[in-house]
Amino acid sequence: MDVAAFVISCLSLVVAGLGTWLANARAKEALEEARRAAADACWSKLQEAVQRLIGFDPAAEPINDRLTNLRIAMTELVEKLGDEWKGLDLWLDSERTLGVTFGRLVMEQARSDDSIDRRLKSLEPLMFWAQVLGQNLRYLRSKGHDGPALSELTEHATSMTLSVHEQQGWEPPRTSNPRVRPLDEDFPRS
């Protein structure tokens, strides 16, 4: 009788251990799925913000809200993907700066007496930029992190921004603010 009780106890222990292991495995899968769903939502929100810039005329209505939504969606995606996507923050910031540059270009070139064809022609840089940004976002979302591609895209957006500023005789965009410093060990805390 003691042997039977011992065997049943051992079997119960094995079943309980196996059940716990399976429950933990399923919980990890569910957590990973939830993380993927949250990241997918951020990708979609950014794509929506980009799509709202295609066909948009900043000479007809303010561009501020659309650029703010774009910046917020970019920030959320960078924060959600974290350190696994090194370089994404730099690329998205350079793209945002390029979008602001094209928005300014469109607004400065617009005239109240523009024909439809002229207006559409002046919108091309902003629309084309938004279309290409959307394509690059879809590519990266489907392929996954690609450090060399992100570096190349960052360099391209930065050089395009500087080129437009130079062509228009504008000052280059600021890349930093001397009044803002990152918090680190050398920064005095109060």
What are these regions (language model features)?
Residues N64-S190:
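An amphipathic alpha-helical interaction surface
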Residues M1-T68:
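Membrane-proximal alpha-helical anchors
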